[in-house]
Amino acid sequence: MAGPTAPTTAPTAIRAGGPLLSPVRRNIIFTALVFGVLVAATGQTIVVPALPTIVAELGSTVDQSWAVTSYLLGGTVVVVVAGKLGDLLGRNRVLLGSVVVFVVGSVLCGLSQTMTMLAISRALQGVGAGAISVTAYALAAEVVPLRDRGRYQGVLGAVFGVNTVTGPLLGGWLTDYLSWRWAFWINVPVSIAVLTVAATAVPALARPPKPVIDYLGILVIAVATTALIMATSWGGTTYAWGSATIVGLLIGAAVALGFFVWLEGRAAAAILPPRLFGSPVFAVCCVLSFVVGFAMLGALTFVPIYLGYVDGASATASGLRTLPMVIGLLIASTGTGVLVGRTGRYKIFPVAGMALMAVAFLLMSQMDEWTPPLLQSLYLVVLGAGIGLSMQVLVLIVQNTSSFEDLGVATSGVTFFRVVGASFGTATFGALFVNFLDRRLGSALTSGAVPVPAVPSPAVLHQLPQSMAAPIVRAYAESLTQVFLCAVSVTVVGFILALLLREVPLTDIHDDADDLGDGFGVPRAESPEDVLEIAVRRMLPNGVRLRDIATQPGCGLGVAELWALLRIYQYQRLFEAVRLTDIGRHLHVPYQVFEPVFDRLVQTGYAARDGDILTLTPSGHRQVDSLAVLIRQWLLDHLAVAPGLKRQPDHQFEAALQHVTDAVLVQRDWYEDLGDLSESRQLAATT
């Protein structure tokens, strides 16, 4: 056979993601996605140690919780829309738009002159952050081969966990040494770098069919949640509980929630189908997830306020002194996920977690201005461990007890309740704190003869003489510890519900117990295909092999020929043309090593060759179809152990299985089945 023509540049018109992107280009894209997720995740916690300074400069202690709450709400509401818009417009366009929105929100946050402007800017920033997070996961799934996807997405998930440590530290340092405004502006240069890579390196990817988006459901649940949080935050502080404003908000929220339930029962693509709550396991997990979010963000937000006003800690020191809680949370969360994945037992963990949270808040309610920092750190470790024991395992329980068709919405549902709980926790802690402080601050100011402007600033407060500062410090200490005492009742309710949690056998379809993104991140809308791919990617390392296929009756091809056949099929699906020189270039192997194998395909009628260009013949396409049937059957045999699949209607599962089978054929690199290069040469030389 004539040798190939002169090498051509590798094709760039990619129709679908896969392993044929060069490793360098793929890693550049993935690094940009990691940094995108990093700035989105950091935005959630970086503001926490800066809050006392922000309140001192902008005023309005009543509205301080909105600096955290509005970000969470904005990110949660946009998740479903961003995922569906990615299907409709293309992931890269949505990523570019999301980063722009995030940058605009970050700039406006840094320019804010009032707490109201900051809250609105934070909501805009949260919208961008939520869209970045969900789009980054989707893009990683498209540019990374199926077999490597778990490892890459695990890195994205770990970013959320790492950020829980680094966010408060960075926010504290920037506040002390630059300005609290830099806690927002620091995102801009990183985001511009992400924009540059996304605009230049991400290929044009295939779009799935036009999705169905539950716009009305998203709008209604956003209105209901926002109204409830506003009522919680303003009740008893800005407005009396019996005022027309608060009553109107509560009535409006109740009407919106009722309409949402009615609407979701009839929606074609419901974001939270009411049928999910027919499962006692799902219903209890949602409530427990709410409690976990309530405790985690409530504590993360108000512990630094305690440390600043009561202990006189700087913003940097406050960030450092929250580390015991975060470390306890991370260790307990990852360890619990691994243990549940190995043992299949889960009930003990949320029970123990809720108990530890109740004990921790009770201990924290006994703190005062003389409590040693070491003892405070111990209490925070207990609190973090309690949150960690509960948080990750709740996602895992829902993923392993839901039916196949509901896995995506069930996972995003339980995560949604955690985020809503975090919003309510921050708002409730803030409202209680303002109420308790107002009762004490007047007498404290009188007894200490302190000028009012000195009160909002922790730094100024602790520079006052002891006789003047002590009554104010005591007022803050008693108010915050009373808030912690109120939190005990919420965790006790969670403990009782955890005791009622029914333990059922776990399925095998989703055991990504160490994916911190599920526990720490925003909700992610997963389709049935996404869920099935999660199961398949775990089976691939020890899964179907070309050697197994070659031994099947009627195959008629050896391992090397099967590999060559699939390479032509992959390149035809992914590129405009199949060139032998391009195959060698992508594999970093001289094309002459594999040329005899492709020539044998031509001789047997499975392929045709015109110089450097290869194509499959009708016989070759039929052979690929036969391989797809064998792979599909292998997947069915191994997925049959998952009870959730047995309850799934055939048509949806069949469609998802076909999608995943095709992804295996197109995205899997079968090169490892040939062994090392010397074995490949021997196979290529064999007739």
UniProtKB/Swiss-Prot annotation:
Xref: PROSITE patterns: MFS, SUGAR_TRANSPORT_2
Keywords annotated in UniProt: Cell membrane, Membrane, Transmembrane, Transmembrane helix, Transport
SUPFAM superfamilies tied to this protein: MFS general substrate transporter, Winged helix' DNA-binding domain
Compartments (UniProt record): Cell membrane
Membrane spanning stretches: 28-48, 66-86, 94-114, 126-146, 154-174, 182-202, 211-231, 243-263, 287-307, 320-340, 348-368, 378-398, 414-434, 480-500
GO terms, biological process: transmembrane transport
Top-rank lineage group of the source organism: Bacteria
Major location category of this protein: membrane
A molecular function GO annotation: transmembrane transporter activity
Gene Ontology cellular component annotations, sorted alphabetically: plasma membrane
Topology in membrane: Multi-pass membrane protein
Family: Belongs to the major facilitator superfamily. TCR/Tet family.
Protein name: Uncharacterized MFS-type transporter Rv1877
